[in-house]
């Protein structure tokens, strides 16, 4: 069977993305046919910063129609509008190739959200762009590994705004889409307030979550969704034995325990998108850029998921 062709967007070149590309190419090529969406000149510069430790001539690259950002010892680890613009164009090209069926999937390396903002890109990040590009799809951010998956009802949203987003109709739509995409038999849903609201004592959000769970289970015809569970104990070992699938109302409630337990191996997946997209679960790691310290386990797992 022919290997799948995977478009790999470069991420922010001032971070660990190019190190991951170079150090992992041999392993990645065992699983798929990688197409790196980056100008070869930038990979050469990256390799020089890494003391020419890697082979670059065998990598299949595709030039990006965007001005080349500076990449040298004085720019690495720093936010740059030019690097932000370049990483966005690399990602957008990957999506275009996937839309045109020229590649089988998209793997995205970490971007810097402030760099995107400085480049006046009107999206918070990868998932926000996908939600705008594919408006007819209920795209869900899910992170995890085989031991634990967490779907986020809200992702890159200020915590103070999450409460207003918790509405029964929207949550039912989300829960059903999550179950359809994952085919999970049991999903544990984290509550929003302390003690999952203590039966309405601490706000009304958890009552809405309960109603959404009941309506979703009724639609499915079986008790798929459990909760709302008090979030402070939802990820205890005895709870994780029930199912690896969780839903969190907010970003950090779900991802803090996931990353405490399985940070190195977890990946980020865009559920319900018309294209296959996966990513590392970590950021640009500017503090260790070009020091040959980047852990590539999450990146390799993202590739394996797509392949």
Swiss-Prot record:
Catalyzes the NAD(P)-dependent oxidation of 4-(phosphooxy)-L-threonine (HTP) into 2-amino-3-oxo-4-(phosphooxy)butyric acid which spontaneously decarboxylates to form 3-amino-2-oxopropyl phosphate (AHAP). Its EC number is 1.1.1.262. It is an enzyme of class 1 (oxidoreductase). Belongs to the PdxA family. One of its GO terms (biological process) is pyridoxine biosynthetic process. This is 4-hydroxythreonine-4-phosphate dehydrogenase. It comes from the Bacteria. The active site is located at the dimer interface. One of its GO terms (cellular component) is cytoplasm. It is found in: Cytoplasm. A divalent metal cation binds at residues 156, 195, 251. Homodimer. GO terms for molecular function: 4-hydroxythreonine-4-phosphate dehydrogenase activity; cobalt ion binding; magnesium ion binding; NAD binding; zinc ion binding. The keyword Heme does not apply. Substrate binds at residues 126-127, 259, 268, 277. The gene is pdxA. It comes from Helicobacter pylori (strain HPAG1). InterPro entries: PdxA_epsilonprot, PdxA_fam.
């Amino acid at each position: 069977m022919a290997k799948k062709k995977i478009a790999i967007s470069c991420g922010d070149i001032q971070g660990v993305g190019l190190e991951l590309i170079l150090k992992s190419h041999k392993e990645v090529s065992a699983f798929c046919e990688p197409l790196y969406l980056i100008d070869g000149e930038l990979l050469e510069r990256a390799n020089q910063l890494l003391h020419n430790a890697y082979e670059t001539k065998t990598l299949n690259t595709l030039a990006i129609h965007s001005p080349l950002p500076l990449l040298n010892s004085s720019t690495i680890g720093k936010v740059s509008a030019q690097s932000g613009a370049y990483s966005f164009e690399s990602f957008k090209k990957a999506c275009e190739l996937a839309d045109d069926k020229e590649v089988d999937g998209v793997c995205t390396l970490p971007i810097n959200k402030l760099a995107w903002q400085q480049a006046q890109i009107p999206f918070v990040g990868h998932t926000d762009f996908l939600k705008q590009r594919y408006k007819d799809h209920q795209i869900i951010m899910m992170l995890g590994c085989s031991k634990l998956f967490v779907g986020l009802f809200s992702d890159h949203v200020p915590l103070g705004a999450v409460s207003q987003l918790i509405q029964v109709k929207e949550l039912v739509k989300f829960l059903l889409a999550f179950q359809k995409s994952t085919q999970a038999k049991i999903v544990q849903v984290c509550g929003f307030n302390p003690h999952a609201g203590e039966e309405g004592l601490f706000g009304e959000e958890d009552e809405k979550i309960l109603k959404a769970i009941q309506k979703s289970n009724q639609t499915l015809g079986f008790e798929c969704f459990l909760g709302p569970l008090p979030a402070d104990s939802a990820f205890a070992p005895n709870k994780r034995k029930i199912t690896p699938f969780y839903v969190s109302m907010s970003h950090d409630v779900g991802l803090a325990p996931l990353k405490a337990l399985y940070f190195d191996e977890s990946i980020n997946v865009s559920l319900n998108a018309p294209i296959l997209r996966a990513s590392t679960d970590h950021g640009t790691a500017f503090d260790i850029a070009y020091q040959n310290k980047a852990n590539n386990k999450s990146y390799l797992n993202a590739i394996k998921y797509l392949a």
